[in-house]
Amino acid sequence: MSKGFLVSLEGPEGAGKTSVLEALLPILKEKGVEVLTTREPGGVLIGEKIREVILDPSHTQMDAKTELLLYIASRRQHLVEKVLPALEAGKLVIMDRFIDSSVAYQGFGRGLDIEAIDWLNQFATDGLKPDLTLYFDIEVEEGLARIAANSDREVNRLDLEGLDLHKKVRQGYLSLLDKEGNRIVKIDASLPLEQVVETTKAVLFDGMGLAK
């Protein structure tokens, strides 16, 4: 690659993004692709500290706008410190959540103004958008059941939210898919992991122009 390529992974809780990414990494490295994987919120020291505040299950009193602004602050620091340098170095950067999460969770889920969120995203990223977004779609009930069955996964504040919020979040993602279908590709995350990995690999390789 002559320049970097930015991929974001999105989806409701329990969609299995992390498991797919773990399976893809050795395949990409075998292809000789320089890959940086990172996550939001987090990715850098300041971002991880903000992540702790956002996801702490005891912070049930957090206001929706406070939550949004914390995500935006983490996003900016993460980009400047880690993502942009990697893209400038020509690497493939795969982010576990990015700008679409704010629209889905704080916009559709919390009911905050979408235009305000778009402006804040623009402000924090200087207009940077992913070259490709992989949206892992799963029914809300199935995703939450996966989380409940996974004893290794630490429960966070968002996991404790009611079913209604998670359904609104999924609708937010589907709305984004309709609006930006040229950038966002939907992947059926309810299928067995091996199939999800193969589909993701095919979509990613096609987007990057890599031979399968």
From Swiss-Prot:
Source organism superkingdom: Bacteria
Q: Which InterPro entries match?
A: P-loop_NTPase, Thymidylate_kin-like_dom, Thymidylate_kin_CS, Thymidylate_kinase
Which CDD domains does the entry mention?
TMPK
Q: Which organism is it from?
A: Streptococcus pneumoniae (strain ATCC 700669 / Spain 23F-1)
List ligand-binding residues for ATP. 11-18
Q: Which family, according to UniProt?
A: Belongs to the thymidylate kinase family.
Q: Which PROSITE patterns match?
A: THYMIDYLATE_KINASE
GO cellular component labels: cytosol
Q: Where are the transmembrane segments?
A: none
Entry's EC annotation: 2.7.4.9
Q: GO molecular-function annotation terms?
A: ATP binding; dTMP kinase activity
Report the catalytic activity. dTMP + ATP = dTDP + ADP
Q: What is this protein called?
A: Thymidylate kinase
Q: Does the keyword Transferase apply?
A: yes
Q: What does this protein do?
A: Phosphorylation of dTMP to form dTDP in both de novo and salvage pathways of dTTP synthesis.
Keywords of the record: ATP-binding, Kinase, Nucleotide biosynthesis, Nucleotide-binding, Transferase
Intrachain disulfide bonds = none
One of the GO BP terms on file: dTTP biosynthetic process
